[in-house]
């Protein structure tokens, strides 16, 4: 619902010659009423750009799926010319002309490269950190990118974990302040401006606390420790108005975060009042089969019912 509005609202006047619905709800309901079930499912798909990066967009398999309404967005596609070429397929050749979202890992800069997140956090300089995200947003948006998979705010206290350098370290307060600064830097005060991009706080939740420091491993933690030591940076990003949240790979209470309704609905939606959209990490849904949660159809339903939207 939210994803459809974010991607279509920018193109509503150009793509629809009739008078656009007055409110967001009316706009979305009108669009949904015209969509087939396959097109609705298609909006859930966020594939990598695949052969578009090496071949002509119009002749690629991904392009064919876009034309058939089976793709909601793409990630890891770069350059204005390539993004424009692919977007034209969506808004000119697909039945409903719903534009695509374009996401990329804009982590510590885009064209201008800043220190890694752990290095930035060591400055304790929030205006500087916010400014780095703002510069990255300006450069990425100029290239046609709408959405970054950042900030990563996972608290980590085990140096064996291989992704420590991507976060802000072990301190929940510092991590929370950086989360707010990064969200503000990326999104600014108005996401409709063409020099801002949608932020995505990740990886929700507890991804930096796997047993033995092994990536993707399970997490066994009390609720008191979760809320006091690991949740604060995610909550700070939500309070700052982050537009999207990425689910983590790890299990929490024996259930992968991607299919964990307590985490994605009870905590994120009901307790924290988050009103953006939730995306899986790369292959997050099929990897639940390795956790023994069922076949692909079963884990897909588990994720959707838990609150996953893309």
Residue ranges and their predicted role:
Residues 1-4:
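Short, small-residue-biased leader/transition segments that mark boundaries at the very start
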Residues 9-310:
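Glycoside hydrolase catalytic-domain context in secreted enzymes
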